[in-house]
Amino acid sequence: MLTIISYLVLLVGALTVTLVIYLGLLKGVKLI
């Protein structure tokens, strides 16, 4: 059970980081 929860946390964290980087790149492109 703990492994499933920790895996989900890692998955959500990775998705959040990807979204933040993607949005940051979009804003950077718009600024240029």
From Swiss-Prot:
Q: Which organism is it from?
A: Stigeoclonium helveticum (Green alga)
Q: How does it assemble?
A: The 4 large subunits of the cytochrome b6-f complex are cytochrome b6, subunit IV (17 kDa polypeptide, PetD), cytochrome f and the Rieske protein, while the 4 small subunits are PetG, PetL, PetM and PetN. The complex functions as a dimer.
Q: Which GO terms describe its molecular function?
A: electron transporter, transferring electrons within cytochrome b6/f complex of photosystem II activity
**Keywords assigned:** Chloroplast, Electron transport, Membrane, Photosynthesis, Plastid, Thylakoid, Transmembrane, Transmembrane helix, Transport
Keyword Thylakoid part of the UniProt annotation: yes
UniProt xrefs under SUPFAM superfamilies: PetL subunit of the cytochrome b6f complex
As for subcellular location, the record says: Plastid, Chloroplast thylakoid membrane
A single Gene Ontology biological process assigned to it is:
photosynthesis
Question: So where does this one cross the membrane?
Answer: 4-24
Entry-linked Pfam families = PetL
Q: According to Swiss-Prot or TrEMBL, what is its membrane topology?
A: Single-pass membrane protein
Protein name as it appears in the record: Cytochrome b6-f complex subunit 6
The family database entries (HAMAP family) matched by this protein are listed as:
Cytb6_f_PetL
Q: Which family does it belong to?
A: Belongs to the PetL family.
- Give GO cellular component annotations, separated by semicolons: chloroplast thylakoid membrane; cytochrome b6f complex
Q: Does the keyword Zinc-finger apply?
A: no
Please explain the role this protein plays, according to its UniProt record.
Component of the cytochrome b6-f complex, which mediates electron transfer between photosystem II (PSII) and photosystem I (PSI), cyclic electron flow around PSI, and state transitions. PetL is important for photoautotrophic growth as well as for electron transfer efficiency and stability of the cytochrome b6-f complex.
